Amino acid sequence: TAIVPETRPVKPKDGTRRWTLADSGLLSLAYVWRDRFNSKKKGEQRYLELRDQVKTQDAAVFKARTINAKPRKYAHRTHASVATQPWRGLLSLGTLATDETLVAIGQSRHLGGGLLVPHDVSKDDFERMIQKEKHSNDK
């Protein structure tokens, strides 16, 4: 199932890296677990802070990529500045959930989409994915 970002991308400032689908995925997790994360900040600074709080729970998004689909099929309403951009990826929920947690994320959850489907990954493959993610974040 596809996920639709809940916000527009955060604009890079002062040499920061650009906002990615993975960042959108982490922010979506913050919105689902909103009782665990909060921020007094506004706008883009809020998005960045919430994303960073989710990262402290060892949550991560891997292999995020857009899909070619009818975008309006996945979101009922978005702000004019938010592109309806369906995407898929592998998410690790870290300490946010157990192996039995059922969760849907993103704008698409309002229409019955965004459901996370379990996908087993070997420990070795998972560790490689973590290393690759760390390496790409260092750039």
Predicted regions and their residues:
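RNA-interacting cores
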Residues: 1-139
